[in-house]
């Protein structure tokens, strides 16, 4: 697979390494402003999905008589069929009316919410978490930020999956962590390349990230594979950061297994939340869970660093923290079943339609997540250089936005969002088929027929 960094082919703003002083004049006297914008986030901002999506929207054709179909990013909450369950809404309303969610909370989160998260996670674990093992965050993304800041030290590196979730790359860049990539293997149903991990790790490696259920591949790792991951991490002396935010979004046959089950082998730091399972990303509530029966996080001062970083960052809204126990305890299984049934239907719909589009292939149906990864067979197409070129021209000609795989570290692949209403996917696939037909390489017979037709037209004109 390509060693290029995500977004390597996309234009990004240039930043001066030295800022020129800006002079201002007033009443005939000149002085220099002593402030200026920082470029600390410049590198991190070049590996975010938003920049790619905005670029594709900018390329949508203003003269194309079709509505824009935004299937490059995922937010199912905007569609009525994915509205969250009434129990979750009632939990927030009850706290709002009680007035119990209006105050500040402690940096780690309010105790009832931390206890509820521990109880929720303990259903899948052989050891028991306590509230002291749980730290609430403003969504899973803030959890990533807290953990990366807690691990950052001079020369440290972290192992991230390819393809992966670009926010990890962005936060590593912001925190000064060197990123090293290990591959997920499509020919092995996106399993982790464990031999590759051993090849890239060294004495400065601090952790590896496992996303399970996987975003963007949609696979769910088996018990045996996760045990091998834990054994590999222990051999290397590194912790495992397990992103499990899609644990309630599974519609395949493989059951979800929490990485925390293997905490007796290696310390596991779990990142999770309710944004995906309950389809409420705007509520911004997630958590960090320390699966560490041997107390390694305390002796290595990772626990201390997490607490210190939480002290200097914003807390999740207290009103949502206060509602969290009821949200977790009163979860309606029928809601999850309905949501996952819709996603499964959408996966089947897309895969069925792709059978008629030879240049776009889905090697493996996803079993989780809200995306579907497809491989572009560019050898079957004319005048398409790569996945970015494909997606830009698709946006320009069809007002259809898909995410190029390059943004995820997977060159010449493409990600399709399935967390939308089915009629949008039907429309999108008709547009995709038309686009691919126009750009398909002509066979020798077709080329000869076109040439003959042109000659015939010329003779008629004469």
Swiss-Prot record:
Its EC number is 4.4.1.-. Gene3D superfamilies: Aspartate Aminotransferase, domain 1, Type I PLP-dependent aspartate aminotransferase-like (Major domain). Keywords: Growth regulation, Lyase, Pyridoxal phosphate. GO terms for molecular function: carbon-sulfur lyase activity; pyridoxal phosphate binding; S-alkylthiohydroximate lyase activity; transaminase activity. GO terms for biological process: adventitious root development; amino acid metabolic process; defense response to fungus; glucosinolate biosynthetic process; indoleacetic acid biosynthetic process; regulation of cell growth by extracellular stimulus. C-S lyase involved in glucosinolate biosynthesis. Converts S-(alkylacetohydroximoyl)-L-cysteine to thiohydroximate. Functions in auxin homeostasis. Probably required for glucosinolate activation in response to pathogens. This is S-alkyl-thiohydroximate lyase SUR1.
């Amino acid at each position: 697979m390509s060693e290029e960094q995500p977004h390597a082919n996309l234009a990004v703003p240039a930043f001066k390494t030295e800022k020129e002083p800006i002079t201002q004049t007033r009443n005939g006297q000149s002085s220099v402003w002593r402030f200026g914008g920082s470029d600390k986030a410049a590198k991190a901002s070049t590996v975010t999905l938003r920049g790619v999506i905005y670029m594709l929207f900018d390329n949508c054709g203003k003269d194309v008589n079709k509505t824009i179909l935004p299937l490059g990013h995922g937010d199912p909450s905007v569609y009525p069929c994915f509205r969250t369950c009434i129990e979750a809404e009632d939990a927030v309303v009850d706290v709002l009316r009680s007035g119990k969610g209006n105050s500040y909370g402690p940096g780690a989160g309010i105790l009832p919410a931390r206890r509820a998260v521990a109880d929720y996670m303990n259903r899948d674990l052989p050891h028991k978490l306590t509230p002291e093992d749980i730290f609430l965050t403003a969504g899973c993304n803030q959890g990533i930020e807290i953990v990366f800041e807690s691990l950052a030290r001079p020369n440290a590196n972290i192992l991230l999956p390819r393809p992966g979730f670009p926010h990890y790359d962005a936060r590593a860049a912001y925190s000064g962590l060197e990123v090293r990539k290990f591959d997920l293997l499509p020919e092995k149903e996106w399993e982790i390349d464990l031999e590759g991990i051993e090849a890239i790790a060294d004495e400065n490696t601090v952790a590896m990230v496992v996303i399970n259920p996987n975003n963007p591949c949609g696979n769910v790792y088996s018990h045996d594979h996760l045990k091998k991951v834990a054994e590999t991490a222990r051999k290397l002396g590194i912790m495992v950061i397990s992103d499990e935010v899609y644990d309630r979004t599974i519609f395949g046959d493989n059951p979800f297994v929490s990485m925390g089950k293997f905490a007796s082998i290696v310390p596991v730091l779990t990142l999770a939340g309710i944004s995906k399972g309950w389809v409420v990303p705007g509520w911004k509530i997630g958590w960090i869970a320390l699966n560490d029966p041997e107390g390694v996080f305390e002796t290595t001062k990772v626990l201390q660093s997490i607490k210190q970083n939480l002290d200097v960052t914003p807390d999740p809204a207290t009103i949502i923290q206060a509602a969290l126990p009821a949200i977790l305890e009163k979860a309606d299984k029928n809601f999850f079943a309905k949501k996952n049934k819709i996603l499964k239907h959408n996966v089947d719909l897309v895969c069925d339609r792709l059978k008629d589009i030879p240049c776009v292939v889905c090697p493996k149906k996803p079993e989780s997540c809200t995306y579907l990864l497809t491989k572009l067979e560019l050898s079957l197409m004319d005048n398409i250089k790569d996945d970015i070129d494909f997606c830009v021209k698709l946006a320009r000609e069809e007002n259809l936005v898909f995410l190029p795989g390059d943004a995820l570290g997977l060159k010449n692949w493409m990600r399709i969002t399935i967390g939308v209403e089915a009629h949008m996917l039907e429309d999108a696939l008709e547009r995709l088929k038309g686009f691919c037909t126009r750009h398909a390489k002509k066979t020798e017979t077709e080329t000869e027929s076109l040439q003959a037709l042109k000659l015939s037209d010329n003779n008629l004109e004469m």
